[in-house]
């Protein structure tokens, strides 16, 4: 796709998770998938839902449907050609390394009720808050202008996180100007930017998922080519999706960071655990040091930190609770919240900073406990090797 190419917008409505649509280990691939021409990219559906193939999810109204990318639509070939097909073409050029960042980074949702500048070493702000939704380029002409707008300290490092609701993510694709967008973001000098998390809905045709993956890779290439330090969002619905990202990472040896978002997976603990296991398998199969930038997934932080070289937690809770006038407190290892009333017109800076301190401490305790466990295991293994050598 060229810079001048027209990008077709999508209208995505909120959907709710259906466990019968989740891939199940040991479940046979649907019969209708075996003859599908897209099987080599998709891998087929292995789900409990009584479907012949993914086309059973088609709404049957191709003339009016604008929700997903479906072969029944007239615009289907246009949407697929925008990303050059379903292949994930390896990126073999240099990728700017991720700068030193703390393992806990709070997300600043907006500047409302903040006085600033916030005394924080690093913060994350939404990519879609700094992009003009009409032109596709940054709203701010300089880093200083952006920091002032979000009440951020001049010395703070900034992550641009591209996780958001579907409508904002899809609109970004609609206004994206690959070269101009990336160059305008480079002027803001972010310490890291994540690629958009184009959705992988479980209740739609797989073609929509395949295009989402290609869009993620397309955005990564544009950001990386502009010299931005970027984390690839490996959004996936099936084991085959994770396998394709693994192959892409192996074939793109310069990529040093990936991103993932657990908050939109749903409240199913087994499903969250499945995604965490897939991430662990991915980094082990890639066999090189990777940084993981993750949103949500607190309960799997220790497991992930044992597999990745570094884990950076992006947290929206501290600011969200401060906006609701709630203060963080610890009861044992459990994080709880209590009311924290403020006077009319009073800023929430101190409340936010307090919440950040408590959440940061909780995050680091999880990470340090896992590191201590890893060191103990390594010491035991070394002792066994030494003992075995001495006996021999």
Report each predicted region and the residues it spans:
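Arginine residue identity/basic-tract feature
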Residues: 13-14, 30, 40, 67, ...
């Amino acid at each position: 796709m060229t810079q001048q190419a027209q990008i077709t917008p999508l209208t995505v409505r909120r959907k709710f998770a259906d466990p019968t649509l989740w891939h199940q280990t040991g479940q046979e691939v649907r019969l209708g998938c075996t003859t599908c021409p897209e099987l080599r990219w998709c891998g087929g559906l292995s789900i409990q839902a009584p479907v012949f193939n993914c086309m059973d999810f088609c709404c049957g109204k191709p003339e009016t449907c604008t929700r997903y990318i479906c072969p029944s639509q007239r615009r289907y070939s246009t949407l697929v050609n925008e990303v050059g097909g379903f292949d994930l073409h390896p990126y073999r050029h240099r990728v700017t390394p991720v700068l030193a960042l703390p393992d806990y980074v709070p997300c600043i949702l907006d500047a409302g009720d903040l006085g600033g500048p916030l005394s924080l070493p690093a913060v994350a702000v939404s990519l879609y808050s700094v992009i003009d939704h009409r032109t596709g380029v940054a709203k701010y002409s300089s880093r200083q202008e952006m920091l002032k707008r979000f009440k951020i300290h001049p010395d703070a490092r900034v992550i641009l996180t591209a996780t958001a609701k579907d409508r904002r993510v899809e609109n970004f694709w609609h206004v994206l100007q690959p070269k101009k967008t990336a160059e305008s973001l480079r002027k803001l000098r972010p310490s890291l930017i994540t690629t958009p998390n184009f959705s992988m809905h479980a209740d739609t045709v797989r073609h929509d998922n395949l295009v989402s993956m290609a869009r993620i890779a397309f955005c990564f290439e544009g950001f990386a080519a502009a010299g931005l330090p970027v984390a690839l969002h490996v959004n996936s619905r099936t084991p085959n999706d994770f396998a394709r990202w693994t192959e892409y990472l192996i074939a793109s040896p310069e990529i040093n960071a990936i991103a993932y978002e657990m908050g939109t997976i749903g409240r199913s603990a087994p499903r969250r655990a499945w995604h965490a296991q897939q991430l662990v398998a991915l980094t082990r199969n890639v066999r090189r040091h990777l940084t993981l930038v993750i949103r949500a997934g607190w309960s799997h932080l220790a497991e992930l930190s044992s597999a990745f070289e570094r884990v950076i937690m992006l947290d929206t809770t501290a600011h969200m609770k401060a906006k609701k006038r709630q203060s963080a407190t610890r009861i044992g290892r459990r994080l709880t919240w209590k009311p924290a009333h403020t006077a009319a017109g009073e800023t929430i800076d101190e409340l936010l900073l307090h919440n950040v301190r408590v959440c940061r401490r909780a995050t680091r305790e999880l990470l340090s406990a896992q590191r201590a466990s890893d060191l103990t295991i390594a010491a035991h293994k070394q002792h066994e090797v030494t003992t075995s050598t001495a006996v021999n």
